[in-house]
Regions:
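Core residues of folded domains in eukaryotic genome-function proteins
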Residues: 10-14, 63-65, 163
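Acidic, polar low-complexity linker/tail segments
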Residues: 1-38, 151-154
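Generic preference for well-ordered alpha-helical elements
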Residues: 11, 37, 41-44, 136, ...
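…and closely analogous acidic/polar surface helices at protein-protein or active-site interfaces
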Residues: 23-64
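DG-centered beta-turn motif at the end of beta-strands
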Residues: 16-21, 40, 69, 146-147, ...
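Von Willebrand factor
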Residues: 94-161
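Surface-exposed acidic, glycine-flexible loop patches that form ligand/cofactor-binding
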Residues: 1-8, 53-61, 148-162
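Divalent cation-coordinating acidic motifs and surrounding scaffolds
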Residues: 25, 42, 52-53, 63-65, ...
Length: 164
C-alpha cells in the first residue's frame, strides 16, 4: 500500500491513450448513429471535466493532477492529442487543462424533476477532444511514448503517488 498523498506538492499523474485509428469509425455497440470515436471523445471529455471539478474549490483550481493524452492512428503518428492552446504539450497541470478547452458546447441531459420524472436540461459541456478515426493502429509506439513521459514525470516527482 502506498502512503503518498495526492496534493499540490505531490500531484498525481494520469496518462490516457486514445485510439484514433480508422477502426474507430465503426459503429459503437451495434448502434448505427454513434461511432466508437464519438463515444471515446465524449468519455475523455467527461473524464477531464470531472477531474477539473474535483480540483476546483470556490474560484480556485488546484493542481492535484497532471494529465497527458496520447493519440495514435492518424498517418500512424503517435503524439500528444491536445489541440488549440495545448497543442504539442504532453503533460499538463489540471488548471491549464480546465482553462483551455477547444470549445464549450450546449448539450442536453436528462435530470430528475423532483416529482419522480425526468426533464431535459441544457448544460454547458467543455470539449478538449474531437472524434478522430484515420490511419493505422501504432499502439506499441503509444505505450512507448507514455513510458517516456512517465519516466520523466517520476524523476520530477519522486515522492508522488504512482502514475495511473
Amino acid at each position: 500500500m502506498y502512503s503518498a498523498e495526492i496534493s499540490r506538492k505531490n500531484p498525481g499523474c494520469f496518462i490516457f491513450l486514445l485510439d484514433q485509428s480508422a477502426s474507430m469509425e465503426d459503429p459503437f455497440g451495434g448502434s448505427s448513429d454513434r461511432r466508437k470515436a464519438d463515444e471515446l471523445a465524449t468519455i475523455i471529455n467527461k473524464l477531464i471535466h470531472n477531474l477539473s471539478i474535483r480540483c476546483a474549490k470556490g474560484d480556485s483550481m488546484y493542481d492535484y493532477f497532471h494529465v497527458g493524452v496520447i493519440g495514435y492512428g492518424q498517418d500512424t503518428v503517435v503524439k500528444s492529442a491536445f489541440d488549440g492552446a495545448l497543442t504539442g504539450k504532453d503533460l499538463i497541470p489540471i488548471s491549464d487543462l480546465a482553462n483551455n478547452p477547444l470549445r464549450i458546447e450546449d448539450r442536453t441531459k436528462k435530470a430528475d424533476d423532483g416529482a419522480g420524472g425526468l426533464v431535459e436540461q441544457t448544460v454547458k459541456f467543455p470539449l478538449w477532444f474531437e472524434p478522430r478515426h484515420v490511419g493505422g493502429t501504432p499502439m506499441s509506439s503509444a505505450f512507448k511514448m507514455a513510458a517516456e513521459i512517465v519516466q520523466r514525470w517520476v524523476a520530477e516527482h519522486p515522492k508522488a503517488f504512482p502514475p495511473s
